[in-house]
Amino acid sequence: MSQKKNLKLIIEYDGTNFLGWQVQKSGRTVQGEIEFALRKIFNTNKISLIASGRTDSGVHAKAQHANIKLMTDMDTKQIQKAINGNIGKDVYVKICEFVNENFHARFNAKIREYRYFITDKYSPLNRNKEWCYLYDLDKELLKKCSDLIIGEHNFSRFCKASSDVKSKICHIYESEWNFNHGSGNYVIKANRYLQHMVRYLVGTMLEVSRGRYSITQFKSLLNDKNDDIMVFRAPANGLFL
């Protein structure tokens, strides 16, 4: 007899042709694609996949965690194979396992990590996985900016203007730029994120690097004290969860 089990999935996807993670009224989403496969496999409409976080349109993931409770007597290898056989080639369930019934992908995720990739050399093969940024990088200024981000701040100036989230306070545990010849990547670890937050941070730090804003101005943005500066949003293609 089938038993209700809590299934954990670790999912990798190329977000280029998705309108983000969350199901929408129209358009292709990662959640929608996987839930469609699950409905087909388990012959039920009672499917509700919970993710550790929601990625925006065009954003990728190397290890998106999700869970769902299902009535099943299938083993995890069978489920993994069935899901991957019913979804597109730009999304893949890497790990599939049964976990404690109390596990919740969103609430159990205390720290979430994002990486943003930039390069100074355009590549047709990598154009959807990194931002080709052709301005010179001031590495010292970028390091100073990233150091300022660590800690607890009000990120009201670094999120989508229409965001209706009550609290815009986030705690940043790690914020660091890494460089290798003409390439770079920015790593951030936080307890939570606001919509477009990482992309606004990356874009605005690069504006400081170009000399368009000062460190003092950037710092004032972190304290939600400067409405005169236009924050710049980096494109989605360089961002990975």
Question: Which residues fall in each region the model found?
Answer:
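Structured-RNA-binding interfaces characteristic of tRNA pseudouridine synthases
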Residues: M1-L241
